């Protein structure tokens, strides 16, 4: 069965059905969006304390995709906030997973979009435009590859090829 046919299948069920073929992210994320279960085709951004490429990517049509941001696990500033959450929602993104921090949680939690992150930080990021888009990114003992499908819910994050 094609991964797209799973829709919002629970991550625990995907692990039971696919065993070792289901890649489980070992990073423990908090849920910050108004939706806690989401899935979609992976689009990636690799950046460090600089969210210019995150903004540029979310300004494109999302078509139900999920943006996976590898911020290097930095807890020193936010890579995503309420304005980017609204941009993602307006452009049809299903969700955003940030290996780093976000801010403006009081607003983001009211929006119907999935958002997972390591934590929160009130400081905004730099604006240098450094990083890479649509490259494999690795964290939490898993690699997220553009075009694969990611599933996220209260139990965690799972990738199916």
UniProtKB/Swiss-Prot annotation:
Name of the top EC class for this enzyme: lyase
Binding-site list for substrate: 81-84, 103
Protein name: Putative 4-hydroxy-4-methyl-2-oxoglutarate aldolase
Keywords, in A-Z order: Lyase, Metal-binding
Entry keyword annotation includes Metal-binding: yes
Species of the source: Thioalkalivibrio sulfidiphilus (strain HL-EbGR7)
InterPro entries registered for this protein in UniProt: RraA (IPR010203), RraA/RraA-like (IPR005493), RraA/RraA-like_sf (IPR036704)
Binding-site list for a divalent metal cation: 104
Source organism superkingdom: Bacteria
Free-text function comment from the UniProt entry: Catalyzes the aldol cleavage of 4-hydroxy-4-methyl-2-oxoglutarate (HMG) into 2 molecules of pyruvate. Also contains a secondary oxaloacetate (OAA) decarboxylase activity due to the common pyruvate enolate transition state formed following C-C bond cleavage in the retro-aldol and decarboxylation reactions.
CDD domains given in the database record: RraA_family
A Gene Ontology biological process term: regulation of RNA metabolic process
Cofactor(s) required, per the database record: a divalent metal cation
Reaction(s) the record says it catalyses: 4-hydroxy-4-methyl-2-oxoglutarate = 2 pyruvate; oxaloacetate + H(+) = pyruvate + CO2
Coiled-coil segments on the chain, per record: none
